[in-house]
C-alpha cells in the first residue's frame, strides 16, 4: 500500500509543478504521459487521476 501512496504523491507533485508553470489541463495530461516517470508509474497514464488532481490543486489556488 505504501508504494501506491508514493506513486500518487509523485503524480500530485508533477501536476502541482505543471500548474506553477501555467500549463493547461491538456498540456498536463500530455506531459504526464510523455514523462520519464510514466515508465515506472502507471498512474501518470491515468487521465482521470491527473484531471482530478489538476482541478483539486487549481481550486485550492
Protein language model regions, located:
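N-terminal acidic leader/helix
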Residues: 1-25
Amino acid at each position: 500500500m505504501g508504494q501506491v501512496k508514493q506513486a500518487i504523491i509523485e503524480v500530485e507533485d508533477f501536476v502541482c509543478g505543471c500548474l506553477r508553470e501555467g500549463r493547461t489541463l491538456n498540456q498536463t495530461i500530455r506531459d504526464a504521459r510523455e514523462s520519464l516517470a510514466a515508465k515506472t508509474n502507471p498512474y501518470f497514464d491515468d487521465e482521470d487521476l491527473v484531471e482530478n488532481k489538476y482541478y483539486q490543486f487549481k481550486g485550492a489556488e
